[in-house]
Amino acid sequence: MNPYNSLKLLLPALFCFTACKNEEMKLADFTSDGCSLFIDGTFEDPDLWKECCLKHDIAYWQGGTEEEREAADIAFRECVKKKTGNSELAEVMYQAVRQGGEPYYPTWYRWGYGWPIGRGYRALTVAEKDLVKIKLAEYRKSTSINQ
């Protein structure tokens, strides 16, 4: 048996491990467009529920598990309901994000949109959570938003 055969198998595995390890750190800077594909408020108050959308965007940007997405969507619905007093509007917006926010869609508003596409539903590692905190602090500092 040729001793180099084992090395031929080990090197590709090592490169794959290194590439997979680095992927967890590729988090884009946080961005928000308010209520993606929807208005941010009423004619009288154009930013009425925009704060709800910003909080929801923070959750969607960082991504995580399927349970975390569901919790973010429920919190979004409750925020809109509290801001507007309109349960029907809150439910329509909730259903829209439930249907359109899957992590597998190649959109700018998908679950986990801060990470490269294909991440799916995966819990954030400690290092990824730390990176999220850093990126959010940078965003807040640059926009003077204290969410």
Model-found features: residue ranges?
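Hydrophobic h-region of N-terminal signal peptides that target proteins for export
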Residues: A13-A19
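Extended terminal accessory/targeting regions
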Residues: C20-Q147
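Sec-dependent signal peptide recognition
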Residues: Y4-P12
